[in-house]
Amino acid sequence: MVQPEDREDGAAVDVILKGKRQMKRKYGVVDYLRKHYPPPEGSGEVEVEFLEGYDSIEGPDGSMGFGVFVPTEEKIYIADDLPGGEESMIETVAHEWKHWLQYCNDEAYDEEEAEDFARQIAEEFL
């Protein structure tokens, strides 16, 4: 499978997988965030993994959610079978992306800020 970071042009990844347009949109939002909301200079990259067949994920603190950013791995995990469809997936990716940016900036995690950012990205992207 082609990974988003393998693309030189920053375009959404065209992956043919069961004919799903959703696959392109999933990686498209990651590409969009990488291009328009990068981390501060000197920060590493974050990996985004979509967990097929999951409708929720347990975070390191034991709480359940649709996605989680794990700082020790610099990785975002997103449940792939979310209620609410595409908009919910985009908001979840953006929410966790914001937590990653907060981490990169040594800021405390702010749920309200992450939710506002998620809604903003959904409006921009859809």
Language-model-detected regions and their locations in the chain:
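Post-HExxH zinc-binding segment in Zn-dependent metallohydrolases
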Residues: E107-L126
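Short pre-active-site segment immediately N-terminal to the catalytic Zn-binding motif
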Residues: I76-T92
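Active-site recognition of the HExxH zinc-binding catalytic motif
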Residues: E91-Y103
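Hydrophobic (often cysteine-bearing) scaffold residues that line and stabilize catalytic clefts
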Residues: R25, E86, I90, D110, ...
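Acidic-and-aromatic substrate-binding clefts and catalytic sites of carbohydrate-active enzymes
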Residues: P83-G84, N105-A108
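Auxiliary, metal-adjacent structural segments of Zn-dependent hydrolase domains
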Residues: R7-G10, D14-Y77, L126
